Amino acid sequence: MRHYEVVFIVHPDQSEQVPAMVERYQTLVTGQGGAVHRLEDWGRRQLAYPIQKLVKAHYVCMNIECGQATLDELEHSFRYNDAVLRHLVIKTKKAQTSPSIMMKSVEREEARKASTEASAPAQAQ
């Protein structure tokens, strides 16, 4: 089995359905003897260019280990799911389990928002 990094972009109106989609794709990979090594939900982010007149979308990254038949079925699922705007599959040499650079930036943004919200009530008094 080979290792792959899969990134897919979901329509922003379907953001609440992302956990169900991720669960379905994880089940597809693990059900056929594969493994999910890393799963990151990057959230709603700005697109580099408009896709279908949209400027924001929901990003998800998965690092998986699977066979070619499973990968073909996964890509087929992406292609015929209208909520998935774009997808990218890259073959990697080994399993990636550490947080990606994008996930680290998401965590930094969340920490910054939390510290701002914590200091806002203190300033109001």
UniProtKB/Swiss-Prot annotation:
It comes from the Bacteria. One of its GO terms (molecular function) is small ribosomal subunit rRNA binding. Residues 105-115 have a biased composition (Basic and acidic residues). Residues 116-125 have a biased composition (Polar residues). Keywords: Ribonucleoprotein, Ribosomal protein, RNA-binding, rRNA-binding. GO terms for biological process: translation. The keyword Ribonucleoprotein applies. Residues 99-125 are annotated as: Disordered. One of its GO terms (cellular component) is cytosolic small ribosomal subunit. This is Small ribosomal subunit protein bS6. It comes from Bordetella petrii (strain ATCC BAA-461 / DSM 12804 / CCUG 43448).
